[in-house]
Regions:
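Canonical tetratricopeptide repeat
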Residues: 3-4, 38, 72-74, 108-109, ...
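Register position in tetratricopeptide repeats
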Residues: 11-12, 45-46, 78-82, 115-116, ...
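Start-of-helix register in tetratricopeptide repeats
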Residues: 34, 67-70, 104, 138, ...
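Structural marker of alpha-solenoid helical repeat scaffolds
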Residues: 28-29, 62-64, 98, 131-133, ...
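Terminal, low-structured helical/coil segments at or just beyond the last alpha-helical repeat
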Residues: 133-182
């Protein structure tokens, strides 16, 4: 109940109440890795990245936590939000070592590669993703941007068309209609 309250309070931007609810959940569910994972995410989203990463590390080490790859991705997002892109990529790669085609880890790595100016690596990650996972607007957007950066207007147009037809109401489709390609 307290965990849910924390998530709801965060959603409605009642951060003090959210933090109090998360802390109650942590006390009541001492050692529960699912509660720890949620609270670690909250810590990261509220700028307490060091504490969040430390708690994610506890979650990852907990043998009762059945999806450590999720905690690795969450820790990577946390590290990146603190400006630690190299650490973030290490976490994403650890997630992929556990679950090789994990969509969120691949997307994160692809975005990081693109942001580093490695458009060919980003393109390759998009292709790997799409070979085994259902498309999302985010991955198609990354594919579009990577192909444009590489100068392949034909491949970029394929991604653009897919975004417009498969995800017409997405932020990415709206960006394309407005001429935004970042």
């Amino acid at each position: 109940v307290q965990l849910t309250a924390g998530l709801v309070y965060e959603r409605v931007n009642e951060m003090k109440k959210a933090e109090s609810a998360f802390e109650s959940a942590m006390r009541l569910g001492k050692g529960n890795p699912n509660i720890q994972n949620a609270y670690a995410g909250f810590l990261c989203r509220t700028g307490k990245n060091i504490a969040g990463e430390k708690l994610f590390a506890e979650v990852i080490r907990n043998p009762l936590y059945q999806t450590p790859e999720v905690a690795f991705v969450n820790a990577g997002v946390c590290a990146r939000s603190a400006g630690n892109v190299l650490d973030a990529d290490r976490y994403f790669n650890r997630a992929i070592a556990i679950r090789p085609n994990m969509p969120e880890a691949l997307l994160q790595l692809g975005n990081d590669a693109f942001d580093r100016g490695e458009a060919a690596d980003a393109r390759d990650i998009v292709q790997r993703y799409l070979a085994v996972n259902a498309p999302t607007a985010d991955i198609l957007w990354l594919g579009f941007r990577a192909q444009r950066k590489l100068g392949d207007s034909v491949a970029a147009a394929v991604y653009a068309r897919r975004i417009q037809t498969e995800f017409p109401n997405s932020e990415q489709a709206q960006n394309m209609r407005n001429g935004v390609d970042r």
